[in-house]
Every structure is written in structure tokens, then in C-alpha cells.
From Swiss-Prot:
Gene name in the database record: hemF
Cofactors named for this entry: a divalent metal cation
Residues bound to substrate: S100, N116, F117, R118, G266, G267, R268
Upper lineage: Bacteria, Pseudomonadati, Pseudomonadota, Gammaproteobacteria, Thiotrichales
Subunit composition and interactions: Homodimer.
Signal sequence interval, chain numbering: none
Organism: Francisella tularensis subsp. holarctica (strain FTNF002-00 / FTA)
Top-level enzyme category: oxidoreductase
Keywords from the UniProt entry: Cytoplasm, Heme biosynthesis, Metal-binding, Oxidoreductase, Porphyrin biosynthesis
Protein name: Oxygen-dependent coproporphyrinogen-III oxidase
Length: 308
């Protein structure tokens, strides 16, 4: 099992380099991803041990902020959040390896994107370890274009159909349901793919699906960035982007499994919260004008069949 974990780690660290390099090619000023390598001290008082590399870009003309973060951590006991629905895992040691990214563009016409790919092994130090994969990618437009959502979902469907034709409808529905702000009765964006507890096939089959899915992120996102990054925008457009970013913050702090797991398990706070946007606003009881571009967004970011 250790050999398989290391193979996935090697894949993720290479993917991290591929993604940051591809995104930098679209940046028009001197902004670059900086590498912040870290390691948790192996001391008795540390609940979580391990290491990682958070790659951050800030202040770009195209990407106002972005993070592509790799981590490999282990602990003696899964935190309560991770075992709430799987009591058989309570008290088990664990290893978690993953890559998580969030890209916040400056231009309101370029959507925010998020992706995450990970493996968990519970009881890795026992004769019967329990493994599963999780991950996916989703898109959060501020001023959406239907063709962008279609391209995003078509890319997702193509990669799913290559492995299992039941995956896309199942993981799309899961994504729609997961990225939902219950307290606002709003969806975060136009969705994509979300899956967890993936071990329905052999390890190698699941590994191949997850790595193919991870490799398709750039195919899904880069064409959208290229198409929208030079659209002129006004302060009104920027203000609405900042307002909608507030919803992104709310979701990450209240509902996001990765954030909650990281904080409960004693993870590296600076890396966990690096996905937050550089700026966001909240307005009391704000409502968009009837018939405005902003009002149309709320009708757009609802679950639908993007691929006819």
C-alpha cells in the first residue's frame, strides 16, 4: 500500500507543476507561483504529521490569487468529522495525500475554478487497510456564458465515460448537491464533478480514473480563461464579483469537507485557508435589480442538464 500511495504522490506533485506552469503562461505581469514547502514536526504534541508544498500566486493581472497545494499527512486517529457517517473507521490511524486548488481571477467574466484529488487510507498500519479516493472539479462563474458551462461539463463527461458511463450523471448530481449553501438556498456555481469514498472498482481502476480526471482539469479550464480574460469590465461588475466571492467564503468555512477535516485534525492553517479569495464583500439584504445581468446569474447557477 505504501508503494501505491507514493505513486499517487508522485503523480500529484508533477500535476502541481503542470498546472502552475500552464496558468503562469496566461499571466501578463510579473506574478508567478511561489513555492512554500512545509513539514509538521514529528513530536508527540502534534496530532497531525506530514509535509506539503503550497504554491501561491497573488497580485496577477489575470489571476488575482490562486493556490495549488499538495499535502501528505498522517495521524493516529481520524477526526470526528471524517467518521461521522462511517463509525467503523473511528479510532483508526490514517494517511491522506491530495492536491487541492482554487483559482480566483481578477476579471469578473473569468470564473473561479476549484479542483481536488485525494486518497485516504484508514488503518494503513494494519493487515486490512481501508482505502478510498475522492475529488472532482467545479466552476463558479460571476457573469456566466452558457458555452463555458457546456465545455466544462462536456470535458467532465468525456473523461467519466472513458471509465464508467454511470459516473458522470452520478458525480454531477453529487456535485450539484454538495456545492449548495443551505442557509442561503443558493448553489455556488454550475457544478462539475464531485465524488468521495470511491473504491467501487480495483485500486488500479480507481487510480486511473482519478488521475485522468485530474489531468482533464486544464483541458476544462484553460480555454475558458483564454476566451474571457480580456473582456472589459466596469466597477459594477467587480463589485458583484466581490459580493459573490462572499458566498465562496461562507461555503468554505461552513460546509467544505476539506477545510473542516484540516482544521479538526490539526492541519496547517495557512495552507488550509489559502483558498480564500483576496477580497470579498457582504452587503446587508442586497438584491439585484430586476432584469439585470446580476439577477440572471441566480437563474443560471441552478442544477441543469448542460449536455443535451
Amino acid at each position: 500500500m505504501q508503494e501505491k500511495i507514493s505513486k499517487f504522490e508522485d503523480f500529484l506533485t508533477q500535476l502541481q507543476q503542470n498546472i502552475t506552469t500552464a496558468l503562469e503562461q496566461h499571466e501578463t505581469n510579473a506574478a508567478k507561483f511561489i513555492s512554500d514547502k512545509w513539514q509538521k514536526p514529528d513530536t508527540p504534541d502534534q496530532k497531525l504529521k506530514g509535509y506539503g508544498n503550497s504554491m501561491i500566486i497573488e497580485g496577477g493581472e489575470i489571476f488575482e490569487k490562486g493556490v495549488v497545494a499538495f499535502s501528505r499527512v498522517h495521524g493516529s486517529e481520524l477526526p470526528p468529522f471524517a467518521t461521522a457517517k462511517r463509525q467503523e473507521l473511528a479510532g483508526k490511524s490514517f494517511i491522506a495525500t491530495g492536491l487541492s486548488l482554487v483559482i480566483h481571477p481578477r476579471n469578473p467574466f473569468v470564473p473561479t475554478s476549484h479542483a481536488n484529488f485525494r486518497i485516504f487510507i484508514a488503518g494503513a498500519d494494519t493487515d486490512n487497510p481501508i482505502w478510498w479516493f475522492g475529488g472532482g472539479f467545479d466552476l463558479t462563474p460571476y457573469y456566466p456564458f452558457e458555452e463555458d458551462a457546456i465545455h466544462w461539463h462536456q470535458t467532465a463527461k468525456n473523461i467519466c465515460d472513458k471509465h464508467d458511463k454511470t459516473y458522470y450523471p452520478k458525480f454531477k448530481k453529487w456535485c450539484d448537491e454538495y456545492f449548495y449553501l443551505k442557509h442561503r438556498d443558493e448553489y455556488r456555481g454550475v457544478g462539475g464533478l464531485f465524488f468521495d469514498d470511491l473504491n467501487d472498482k480495483s485500486f488500479d481502476e480507481c487510480f486511473n480514473f482519478v488521475t485522468d480526471c485530474a489531468n482533464s482539469y486544464l483541458d476544462a479550464y484553460i480555454p475558458i480563461v483564454a476566451q474571457r480574460k480580456n473582456i472589459e469590465y466596469s466597477q459594477k461588475h467587480k463589485d458583484f464579483q466581490l459580493y459573490r466571492r462572499g458566498r465562496y467564503v461562507e461555503f468554505n468555512l461552513v460546509f467544505d469537507r476539506g477545510t473542516i477535516f484540516g482544521l479538526q485534525s490539526g492541519g496547517r492553517t495557512e495552507s488550509i485557508l489559502s483558498s480564500m479569495p483576496p477580497m470579498a464583500t457582504w452587503k446587508y439584504n442586497w438584491q439585484p435589480e430586476l432584469g439585470s445581468e446580476e439577477e440572471k446569474v441566480y437563474q443560471y447557477i441552478k442544477p441543469r442538464d448542460w449536455i443535451k
